[in-house]
Amino acid sequence: MKTPIAIGAEKKSLITPLPASIDPLRLPEHIAIIMDGNGRWANAKKLPRAMGHSAGVDALKQTLRLCNDWGIGVLTVYAFSTENWSRPKEEVNFLMTLFERVLKKELEALNLEEVQISFLGDLDQLPTRLQDLINEATELTSGNNGIRFNVCTNYGGRRELVLAAQKLAQRVLQGDLDPSFIDEHTFAGELLTSSYADPDLLIRTSGEMRISNFLLWQLAYAEIHVTDTLWPDFDSISLTKALIDYQSRRRRFGGVDPTVNDYDQV
């Protein structure tokens, strides 16, 4: 668990305390979130889909700050998938503009809160101005000591695995790597998430029971919490419920519960 970052007395007064129902010693180090339901939230309120995406940004800002305050080490969110380009052009253009606007508005505050921002995905396909902002945000916050905030943008899990395989193949062709030495550790080292541990907890909003091509390798042993809450409505209570659910699990990583031994009864 990462120690919450407080900058001066003013910052200390703004930290949201961890709910008493959550064990601070058993927090997940890394939380991943599939932020789903912006469009349905807007449709239910008879609002334009753009309003749903804007409301989703507010939910993300609150969730990020709570995770930072509560000592979560890494937060990785699925912001824009490689498949999202197939959405209507107007919606895609709005999302790109929204990314740019939010980065410009929030970067200074996030830097003051010691958030370290990274963007994971095929960033070369993004608009040039957005790429420039992403580079600025990454460079500005690279030395921060707060939560690691990964924004998966133009990201696809299968694409990430293919690129990792291509990198390994290139190393073999160049004579830098013996194929017999390739193992899980070597493969994971070529992934976009190679600098930190895999997610402990995956949260998916909107009730959908799928992972949607998100972190296919990294989610191998993650605990999964699915909530019917639409992403714009996700709040501190929603996050608390997810953490309580996580702490109720016995993580066995393919093994068995050491407190249970049925063979003694045979």
UniProtKB/Swiss-Prot annotation:
Listed EC numbers: 2.5.1.-
Principal EC category: transferase
One of the protein's GO biological processes: polyprenol biosynthetic process
Chain positions recorded as substrate binding sites: 37-41, 49, 53, 81-83, 85, 87, 204, 210-212
PROSITE patterns, sorted: UPP_SYNTHASE
SUPFAM superfamilies: Undecaprenyl diphosphate synthase
Cofactor(s) of this protein: Mg(2+)
Residues annotated as the enzyme's active site: D36, N84 (proton acceptor)
Keywords, ordered alphabetically: Magnesium, Metal-binding, Transferase
Membership in a protein family: Belongs to the UPP synthase family.
Subunit structure, as described in the record: Homodimer.
Protein name according to UniProt: Isoprenyl transferase
Organism this protein belongs to: Prochlorococcus marinus (strain SARG / CCMP1375 / SS120)
